[in-house]
Amino acid sequence: MRFALTVTGPAYGTQQASSAWQFAQAVLQEGHELACVFFYREGVLNANQLTAPASDEFDLVRGWQSLHDEHGVALHICVAAALRRGVTDEREAQQLALPGHNLQPGFTLSGLGALAEAALTCDRMVQF
């Protein structure tokens, strides 16, 4: 079965993102395909490379990155939601004359078209 996830909660402060990450791990362990994760609203904060959790906490931002690196899962960040919340890549930062960028490697700024495509091409879409 082919899955896609939508994450609307931040990396820290709610259970949404950590529950989504655990669900993603279970999907892959059961032999299913995880096509993509689309981060929307506060969920875009999962892509902020400046996040620095305490040493005894799981680093969820790098956890998502490892999901991409090890399993090829596409990590889409809603570009409009990201820019509103101060998450940007180098290209957008230059275009908007921002002083820096902070998008974690492995994540991609995307439009809602990526979410629509996932809804059309996956068997299940699960929102957290």
Swiss-Prot record:
Active-site residues from the entry: C78 (cysteine persulfide intermediate)
Gene3D superfamilies registered for this protein in UniProt: DsrEFH-like
Alphabetized InterPro entries for the sequence: DsrEFH-like, Sulphur_relay_DsrE/F-like, Sulphur_relay_TusD/DsrE
Keywords of the record: Cytoplasm, Transferase, tRNA processing
Enzyme Commission code: 2.8.1.-
Keyword Thylakoid included in the entry's annotation: no
Molecular function terms, GO-annotated: sulfur carrier activity; sulfurtransferase activity
Record's GO cellular component terms: sulfurtransferase complex
Localization in the cell: Cytoplasm
SUPFAM superfamilies membership: DsrEFH-like
Keyword Plastid: no
Gene Ontology process terms (BP): tRNA wobble position uridine thiolation
Functional summary from the UniProt entry: Part of a sulfur-relay system required for 2-thiolation of 5-methylaminomethyl-2-thiouridine (mnm(5)s(2)U) at tRNA wobble positions. Accepts sulfur from TusA and transfers it in turn to TusE.
Family statement drawn from the similarity comment of this UniProt entry: Belongs to the DsrE/TusD family.
HAMAP family: Thiourid_synth_D
Quaternary structure and partners: Heterohexamer, formed by a dimer of trimers. The hexameric TusBCD complex contains 2 copies each of TusB, TusC and TusD. The TusBCD complex interacts with TusE.
Name of the protein: Sulfurtransferase TusD
Organism this protein belongs to: Klebsiella pneumoniae subsp. pneumoniae (strain ATCC 700721 / MGH 78578)
Gene name linked to the record: tusD
